[in-house]
Amino acid sequence: MSYFETEGNSTCVMTYSHDGFGLGHLRRNTTIASVLARQVPDSSVLMLIGCPSGAVFKLPTGVDFIKLPSVIKRNTGVWLPMRLRIGLEKTKALRVATIQEAVRVFHPQALLVDHVPVGIWGELLPSLQMLKRRSDAPTIVLGLRDILDAPEVTRTLWERDGTYEAIRRYYDEIFIYGHKEIFDTGASYGLDGEFASKLHYLGYVCEQEPYKSQQEMRQELQVENKLVVITGGGGADAFPMMLECMKALQVLGGNSGLEVIFITGPLMEGGQREHLRELAKGLQARVLVHVDDHLSYMNAADLVVTMAGYNSLYQLIRLRKKGLVIPRPGPSAEQQTRARLFAERGLVDVVRPGELSPKRLAEKFMDDLERTDYPLYDPTFDTNGSRKAADRLAEQLTATRVSSTACYRERGQGDTRIYR
């Protein structure tokens, strides 16, 4: 472990993810922050996160986080405190104050905001206003996954909440973590007109850590039969899918010739996880919570079963594994849209919510293990989004440094003004 006793001249970058549901926002920002910390050796990346489990993923030297009070998304635009018994207004005030003070003290040269331009409840607005008033104003970037919701739903919500005006006023660039040829995020969500010059399609943000070969991991897991890995991402909404999968294994019986590993994710409720463990008794099935080497588990599989969340699906496609995808039925159209698009390209197989039953799943498990017609190779599928995002941020940091050479901060008693 490294320790740093001097203040130094670190390049400061801040990221924000509300993390009101799942790990997708946190995973993207963590991956980009890790790449940036390696590419810019003097950088410090401070992540503002809301995940109830903390940072979850390994952080390299140069990356740290501040945990905001946890909230949970109950419906589109509806958020509630998750753990503290202090009421909605106090939770809002505490998050706003924590963010604002972190921004003031850390004094970032770049801010990367994932998914929600003004934060939940508009909690980023005071900090965005403060940053824009600085004479050495940082680069402010909005990062968006490829598919947010049905276009009409997102457009209506953004119009209602003043999101377009906030993007116009505060954001210098918009990173799209996807491919325009596969899904035109800009056109779908009204960002292709006056905002077109800010848009950068960077490809998919996938974990860049090394992973073990299929043979090595299977030996480590002592697997001799066909292996099915069932993963639920963060796990907050994975129980219904995993319960159906467990029932499908019961349909197949203990002599199916399959070995199955469930990775529930750290956000699944404990009672739900224990119920799965009870059902797994007598089957060739293991139920795990969270594994650091998630990619190696997926790579060891003959078939991966997952939902259609951003991280799980794109890691699956990056590994070029057979994947049976069970998209979440709602509340947004994100997962069903993504599953349909990638099934049409021959990259995954899909069981749609209306088709879901233990018998249907059992048939799919066995059929997909024997199929040889997928996944197809798709040359447009670029998984270097984290590197491209880090490269773009590094370019902006260099430009900011050059433009700030005439600036110095005079620190006196109670004085933190910027002079040119």
Regions found by a protein language model. Give the residues of each.
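A nucleotide-sugar donor-handling region in carbohydrate enzymes
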Residues: L144-F239, G270
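Conserved nucleotide-sugar donor-interacting segment of glycosyltransferase catalytic cores
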Residues: Q100-R169
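Donor-nucleotide binding loops and adjacent catalytic segments primarily
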Residues: Y204-L303, Q336, G354
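A short, glycine/small-residue-rich beta-strand->loop->alpha-helix junction that serves as a flexible
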Residues: S17-T30, F239-P240
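C-terminal amphipathic helix plus adjacent low-complexity
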Residues: E363, D368-R420
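A donor-sugar binding/catalytic signature common to diverse glycosyltransferases
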Residues: D292-T337
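Conserved nucleotide-sugar phosphate-binding/catalytic loop shared by glycosyltransferases and other
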Residues: S10, T15-S17, V35-K90, L94-V96
